Amino acid sequence: MSTVYTRPLARLIEQLQRLPGVGPKTAQRLALHLLKRPDSEVQALAQALLEAKQQVGLCSVCFHLSAEPVCEVCRAPSRDEGTLCVVADSRDVIALEKTREYHGKYHVLGGLISPMEGIGPEQLHIQPLIQRVSQTAVEEVIMAISPSIEGETTTLYIAQLLKPLTKLKGAKVTRIAFGLPMGGDLEYADEVTLARALEGRRELD
């Protein structure tokens, strides 16, 4: 990095650039802003980061982010046990919860099948999904995966795995009706679009 920065500042900017969506200019702006803040604020930020990293893990049931062994959604008796919404990661759970239209349970895959990145089905939480569907009273599995190439691959792969199981149980696999362009991310859709996508879901053949 340019010698215009002192070494500690250069290191801070480099680390900030590792964050998603943060380029060199944004990293510089954030770093300079932090240096102007009182020590107490910077220490509070650092402490919050450490606590989140140390205390937040994955729910043992659905693999959503949780500070407890089982997350609030999985523990809630008011949630519909008959519907299970499959998403790529926790950002999608947050986006769907904001719609206030979905009242079932979730299953977080932890990513998407992507041979180019070396991510196969075995790296995702697909087998636990199959076990949940086979062992619980799930009547509908909703595939809420972004319509990218990786998303389509993952959706169709899981649908094929679930097909004999859901047929045996009299259940169904559906997918949400995206109002997104190909490659659009679920987390960036507004609440109205997501709510309509849930309402307009259709069964996968």
Curated annotation (Swiss-Prot):
Question: Which Gene Ontology BP annotations are present?
Answer: DNA recombination; DNA repair
Identify the residues that the record assigns to the Toprim domain, covering every copy.
82-181
Q: Which domain of life is it from?
A: Bacteria
Alphabetically, the GO molecular function entries are: DNA binding; zinc ion binding
Give the stretches traversing the membrane: none
UniProt key word Zinc-finger: yes
Similarity comment text for this entry: Belongs to the RecR family.
Q: Which HAMAP family match?
A: RecR (MF_00017)
Function text: May play a role in DNA repair. It seems to be involved in an RecBC-independent recombinational process of DNA repair. It may act with RecF and RecO.
**Protein name (database record):** Recombination protein RecR
Species of provenance: Cyanothece sp. (strain PCC 7425 / ATCC 29141)
